[in-house]
From Swiss-Prot:
The keyword Phosphoprotein does not apply. PANTHER family: 6-PHOSPHOGLUCONOLACTONASE (PTHR30344:SF1), 6-PHOSPHOGLUCONOLACTONASE-RELATED (PTHR30344). GO terms for cellular component: cytosol. It comes from Enterobacter sp. (strain 638). Gene3D superfamilies: YVTN repeat-like/Quinoprotein amine dehydrogenase (2.130.10.10). This is 6-phosphogluconolactonase. HAMAP family: 6P_gluconolactonase. It catalyses: 6-phospho-D-glucono-1,5-lactone + H2O = 6-phospho-D-gluconate + H(+).
Length: 331
């Protein structure tokens, strides 16, 4: 399995393309100059395209991915109705979802053979919208509205329209600020990182009454932390054994172990990392984690070690200015 790491640096308007070597190092393959401040990125389900959100002219760019070395070639672009804070796709590669924090909206862009074509739906009134996350069954879009302490739930239709479900939302505690989320591989649980109180919520997707329920909340910060809380990102290993969340004020990555059924988290440790880690990701083998320091202008590569899933630094690499996003593609 070949793996490629992509890092987005909006201040220098660049994407750095890296080969992830099996022994735990990165080799630079390409530096792409992007026509705009590049922020969120996602790889298409079929691994053929990298989709990139840019501003100040709000667009999604599509780059073809070389199956040989992961290098990028520009393919197409389409306008977006708001500044893209987060982008993702449905699991069939038919639609792109773009969450916009500033616009308080989520939009749906139709794809034709991997190429973004047109906006087919937009939902507004989602204050502080920070991500859009399709459920494992590809039916429900989870959209955290950070400023409203709620996660809105929409049914995705075959033509890409979003219909509010009943109930239409789940709510966090006041002041939590739900931001990003991941699903457990068993499709029974979701984990949400809350920006404003630096916590992680465990959501049971189908409790005995058929409802969505928050069953655990954990503080991701050390007990003696007394500064402003500013959590950012969350990711899970492919085997569902370990979860990681980061906080930007402390520049820490918190390491969690996950119970066998996915219902319980336990903190295993705290990993100091690059300054102001806004984004990170885990490779497809579950062996490595790559974190981006928005203020250090570097990425750090870690090996995930042992039963606890603790992190061992393998190297750090200069990228562009203000790196914010990391994605990994297996090809």
């Amino acid at each position: 399995m070949k793996q490629t790491v992509y890092t987005a640096s909006p201040e220098s308007q660049q994407i750095h393309v890296w080969r992830l070597n099996t022994e735990g190092s990165l080799t630079l393959v390409q530096v792409v100059d992007v026509p705009g401040q590049v922020q969120p990125m996602v790889v298409s389900p079929d691994k053929r395209f990298l989709y990139v959100g840019v501003r100040p002219e709000f667009r999604v760019l599509a780059y073809r991915i070389s199956p040989d070395d992961g290098a990028l070639t520009f393919a197409a672009e389409a306008p977006l109705p708001g500044s893209p804070t987060h982008i993702s796709t449905d699991r069939q590669g038919r639609f792109i979802f773009s969450g916009s924090y500033n616009a308080g909206s989520v939009s749906v862009t139709r794809l034709e053979d991997g190429i973004p074509v047109e906006t087919v739906d937009i939902v507004e009134g989602l204050e502080g919208c920070h991500s859009a996350n399709i459920s494992p069954d590809n039916r429900t879009l989870w959209v955290p509205a950070l400023k409203q302490d709620r996660i809105c739930l929409f049914t995705l239709s075959d033509d890409g329209h979003l219909q509010a479900q009943n109930p239409a939302e789940v709510t966090t505690v006041e002041g939590a600020g739900p931001r990003h989320m991941v699903f457990h591989p068993n499709q029974q649980y979701a984990y949400v990182v809350n920006e404003l109180n630096s916590s992680v919520d465990v959501w049971e997707l189908h409790n005995p009454n058929g409802q969505i329920e928050c069953i655990q909340t954990l503080d991701i910060m050390p007990a003696d932390f007394a500064d402003t809380r500013w959590a950012a990102d969350i990711h899970i290993t492919p085997d569902g054994r370990h979860l990681y969340a980061c906080d930007r004020t402390s520049s820490l990555i918190t390491v969690f172990s996950i119970s066998e059924d996915g219902s319980v988290l336990a903190i295993e440790g705290f990993q100091p990392t690059e300054t102001q880690p806004r984004g990170f990701n885990i490779d497809n083998s579950g062996k490595f984690l790559i974190a981006a320091g928005q203020k250090s202008h570097h990425i750090a590569l870690y090996e995930i070690k042992g039963v606890q899933g603790l992190l061992e630094e393998k190297g750090r690499y200069a990228v562009g200015q203000g790196p914010m996003w990391v994605v990994v593609n297996a090809h």
